[in-house]
Design a protein with these regions (language model features):
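Active-site-proximal beta-alpha core segment in soluble small-molecule metabolic enzymes
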Residues: 102-103, 108, 123, 129-136
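Active-site metal-binding motif and surrounding structural segment of the metallo-beta-lactamase
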Residues: 37-53
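Divalent metal-coordination and catalytic microenvironments
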Residues: 8, 23, 28, 50, ...
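N-terminal metal-binding scaffold of metallo-dependent hydrolase/deaminase domains
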Residues: 1-40
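Divalent metal-dependent hydrolysis catalytic cores, especially in the metallo-beta-lactamase
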Residues: 77-100, 117-129, 143-155
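Short, acidic/polar
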Residues: 71-79, 131-141
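Acidic (Asp/Glu)-rich catalytic clusters
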Residues: 109-116, 139-144
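Metal-associated gating/positioning segment near the N- to mid-region
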Residues: 49-113
Length: 155
């Protein structure tokens, strides 16, 4: 699919751009900014006037309700809300209920997130079992399951 995003305020820190620009996308990749490539025919045109066009945002502390508190919110609803706000990746602290202190829980979370295919989820593993501050978790196993770092949130 070829997409033309027009009239949007492009903010691209990597390339030092903060200006109204058109963006041209083909096969999911940005192929041009400003002027269209030769023979570019968009199958979809998005008028982004009054909107910001930028790289995906990363939220470093998303308090997930899953596992354990799905009656409040599901991974799907929380990921949908994040993506609607421009967040494409997020880290989730271990203070869920139950805490992210078991490899099986982390694997389940990563598997569900991958199947939803909305945003990248980076679990933060519990530093101690049950977040009680007494015994360390099996950090190597948690890392193998997908934890990127470990933490001990204040209770």
């Amino acid at each position: 699919m070829k997409i033309h995003i027009k009239n949007g305020r492009l903010i691209d820190p990597k390339n030092g751009i903060d200006a109204v620009r058109d963006v041209f996308i083909a096969k999911g990749k940005i192929i041009a900014i400003g002027m269209p490539p030769d023979e570019f025919q968009a199958s979809r045109i998005i008028d982004a006037q009054s909107f910001i066009v930028c790289p995906g945002l990363v939220d470093l502390s998303v308090r997930l309700r899953e596992p354990g508190l799905e009656y409040k919110a599901t991974l799907e609803s929380e990921m949908g809300a994040a993506v609607a706000g421009g967040v494409t990746s997020f880290a989730c602290p271990p203070d869920t209920d139950p805490p992210l202190d078991e490899p099986g829980l982390v694997e389940m979370l990563k598997h569900r997130a991958k199947n939803l295919n909305q945003a990248h989820v980076y679990p933060i593993g519990a530093l101690t079992q049950g977040l009680r501050g007494e015994r360390l978790t099996e950090m190597a196993e948690l890392n193998d399951a997908g934890c990127i770092v470990f933490g001990q949130p204040d209770g």
